[in-house]
């Protein structure tokens, strides 16, 4: 009787241990990203309740998106740099896997702007770990040329990296 009880307890302990290890592995391999529409981020409902840091971040994002900045463009394997110490990197989904080896001036990039060109690309992934060599990167901004939702963009985001804010915008028409 004692042997059976011991075996049952041992089996229960083993099962719980394996389950908890799998749960930990799953939670660290992918993270749920909070993707927000850029217009919602840039126009907070009540700026009086925003911290000074949050307001500075909003101003920084506005400046990066709307003001002329030194920029790198990387499309179809071709890197073009305009200005010294680029802060913006413009690219498309098809070019992401080559960014680490192709981009020469990474140290000052604060925002990567990724263009989605068709709805089939929503089935692809954006692995945030691809951006780990961009030391000053803070923002990922996804511009979609077709209707999409924050949830659809969230489903594309994989990889563990909590330091980036991820935004999106639907912008039909030519953005280049």
Q: What is each model feature region?
A:
Residues 1-27:
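Bacterial Sec-dependent N-terminal signal peptides
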Residues 2-4, 37, 46-49, 92, ...:
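Serine/threonine-rich low-complexity intrinsically disordered regions
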Residues 18-86, 174-176:
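Sec-dependent signal peptide cleavage junction
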Residues 24-34, 98-100, 120-124, 147-152:
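Short, charged/polar "capping" segments at the starts of alpha-helices
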Residues 50-53, 101-104, 129:
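Recurring C-terminal helix/loop segment of individual leucine-rich repeat
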Residues 78-122:
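LRR N-terminal entry segment and analogous cap-like coil->beta motifs
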Residues 104, 108-176:
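Extracytoplasmic electrostatic interaction patches
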